[in-house]
């Protein structure tokens, strides 16, 4: 049996998956199911995935992480440090409680909230901040997203995203 989503994906042949932010996990079951299926498809075909906020939470919970409620992370800015160091915006009520299996932490906030992760062998990253909510995109975000989303292309010299 092939789900309607997988049938659609087989016809459109996406080269990457972007999971956007939005409502909390569990508020809209159909969206949750669809996005988990997108991750299954991306894993099966080794597609790059960029998960923004809720998208990162989906990636993490799919890998076994738990979510916890956090305060002070809605409509604010704060610094993140680690492999990624930046000042970012923040709009989330929940954070992942632990780094999921087969993932590496890329950044944490000052209060030790995990703000970015990457899969250890799949071309997947998750960021809790929202680059799309910035007036000017951060160069670091553009460079990381471009590199990640092009990671499965054979010859990226002439490709534009």
Residue ranges of model-derived segments:
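Proline-centered loop/turn at the N-terminus of a beta-strand
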Residues: 48-50, 104, 123
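Catalytic beta-strand/loop cores that center a nucleophilic Ser/Cys/Thr
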Residues: 84-121
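A conserved active-site-flanking secondary-structure segment within enzyme catalytic domains
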Residues: 28-40, 60-88
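Active-site-proximal beta-strand elements of phosphoester/diester hydrolases
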Residues: 87-88, 125-129
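Flexible gly/pro-rich beta->alpha loop and the following alpha-helix that scaffold active-site loops
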Residues: 1-50, 63
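Acyltransferase
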Residues: 132-161
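Gly/Ala-rich beta-loop-alpha elbow adjacent to hydrolase catalytic centers
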Residues: 51, 55, 60
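Active-site glycine-centered loops adjacent to acidic/histidine catalytic or metal-binding residues
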Residues: 53, 92, 130
């Amino acid at each position: 049996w092939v789900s309607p989503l997988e049938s659609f994906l087989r016809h459109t042949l996406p080269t990457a998956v972007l999971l956007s932010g939005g409502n909390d996990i569990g508020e809209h079951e159909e969206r949750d199911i669809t996005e988990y299926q997108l991750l299954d498809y991306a894993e099966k075909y080794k597609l790059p995935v960029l998960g923004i906020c809720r998208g990162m939470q989906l990636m993490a919970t799919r890998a076994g992480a738990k979510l916890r409620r956090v305060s002070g992370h809605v409509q604010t800015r704060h610094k993140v440090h680690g492999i990624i160091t930046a000042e970012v915006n923040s709009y989330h009520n929940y954070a992942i409680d632990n780094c999921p299996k087969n993932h590496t932490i890329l950044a944490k906030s000052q209060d030790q909230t995990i703000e970015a992760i990457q899969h250890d062998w799949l071309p997947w990253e998750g960021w809790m901040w929202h680059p799309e909510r910035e007036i000017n995109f951060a160069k670091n975000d553009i460079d990381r997203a471009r590199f990640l989303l092009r990671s499965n292309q054979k010859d990226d010299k002439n490709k534009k995203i």
